[in-house]
Amino acid sequence: MWGLKVLLLPVMSFALYPEEILDTHWELWKKTHRKQYNSKVDEISRRLIWEKNLKYISIHNLEASLGVHTYELAMNHLGDMTNEEVVQKMTGLKVPASHSRSNDTLYIPDWEGRAPDSVDYRKKGYVTPVKNQGQCGSCWAFSSVGALEGQLKKKTGKLLNLSPQNLVDCVSENDGCGGGYMTNAFQYVQKNRGIDSEDAYPYVGQEESCMYNPTGKAAKCRGYREIPEGNEKALKRAVARVGPVSVAIDASLTSFQFYSKGVYYDESCNSDNLNHAVLAVGYGIQKGNKHWIIKNSWGENWGNKGYILMARNKNNACGIANLASFPKM
């Protein structure tokens, strides 16, 4: 009985003594995430959103403890934002209207032999630290750079931070902080004959004029390959054989915004509504749940140190295999 009381506390606190506890919690949250507001009105409206999110998190975690969900949520630095605002300000996948796959760029998996049961490129030293795109729709640039970094390590043995800002400023087919697409980025690096390192061309989180300098060049690209649409088995092969792969997902749900640990699976995730680009750096299984290991670009304070485990072989959950691609180096 005591166990149930503990479980119900977070939900009950809203009903029993909301104000004092919430006041303290709110002040602590603001301090932790260095939040400042322009006016009292602004702060009140943000606090209402934060309270709604906190309640959502508490109820979800209560359900998770009763076995309803395979993942848990936690309050984070996005606490005073609605899920619509997160999509608007912190995603940025823009698929070209004319996008059609050609046989020239289609990845044809080598089905010989078995793919390993699990792969984690973080352990192999293929993955740079988690970055934060800020309030710029540049997810596509971070996803592209992550895939290029993996191939650079594979080819040269060197792990190096490449420049998403180079892509934000210089890929004319994309729209900078207004959004873009990964294969456009790979094509730019190919035509440009290179991409600068992060040190040579640091990230500023807004679109500026193109300042690419060949002296800062750290990697090249010979083109790209696209995974057959919606084919998770082909995506698994690509991750196992090639390295980290750029993928697009639906990141529009509140459950994604506050993901903390476990294997993320939300039936409301829409595989036809892809809005965010991330990086698949491996796959595996946790407590019987197959998953993809996904690197996000919302900083280390988001998710599990910047990562999320997303359901694998669950009918292409969140559309993870719909727009997957990787660069050739």
UniProtKB/Swiss-Prot annotation:
CDD domains to which the protein is assigned, alphabetical: Peptidase_C1A (cd02248)
Disulfide pairings: 136-177, 170-210, 269-318
Chain residues in the propeptide: 16-114
Gene3D superfamilies: Cysteine proteinases (3.90.70.10)
Keyword line: Cell membrane, Disulfide bond, Glycoprotein, Hydrolase, Lysosome, Membrane, Protease, Secreted, Signal, Thiol protease, Zymogen
UniProt superkingdom: Eukaryota
PROSITE patterns referenced in this protein's UniProt entry, alphabetically: THIOL_PROTEASE_ASN (PS00640), THIOL_PROTEASE_CYS (PS00139), THIOL_PROTEASE_HIS (PS00639)
Signal sequence, renumbered to the chain: 1-15
InterPro entries registered for this protein in UniProt: Papain-like_cys_pep_sf, Pept_asp_AS, Pept_cys_AS, Pept_his_AS, Peptidase_C1A, Peptidase_C1A_C, Peptidase_C1A_papain-like, Prot_inhib_I29
Subcellular location: Lysosome; Secreted; Apical cell membrane
Keyword Transport: no
Catalytic activity: Broad proteolytic activity. With small-molecule substrates and inhibitors, the major determinant of specificity is P2, which is preferably Leu, Met > Phe, and not Arg
GO annotations of cellular component type: apical plasma membrane; extracellular space; lysosome
Predominant location: other
A GO MF term: cysteine-type endopeptidase activity
EC number assigned by the record: 3.4.22.38
Coiled coil residues, start to end: none
Location of the active site: 139, 276, 296
SUPFAM superfamilies: Cysteine proteinases
Keyword Transferase on entry: no
Top enzyme category: hydrolase
Stated role: Thiol protease involved in osteoclastic bone resorption and may participate partially in the disorder of bone remodeling. Displays potent endoprotease activity against fibrinogen at acid pH. May play an important role in extracellular matrix degradation. Involved in the release of thyroid hormone thyroxine (T4) by limited proteolysis of TG/thyroglobulin in the thyroid follicle lumen.
Name of the protein described by the UniProt record: Cathepsin K
Species per Swiss-Prot/TrEMBL record: Macaca mulatta
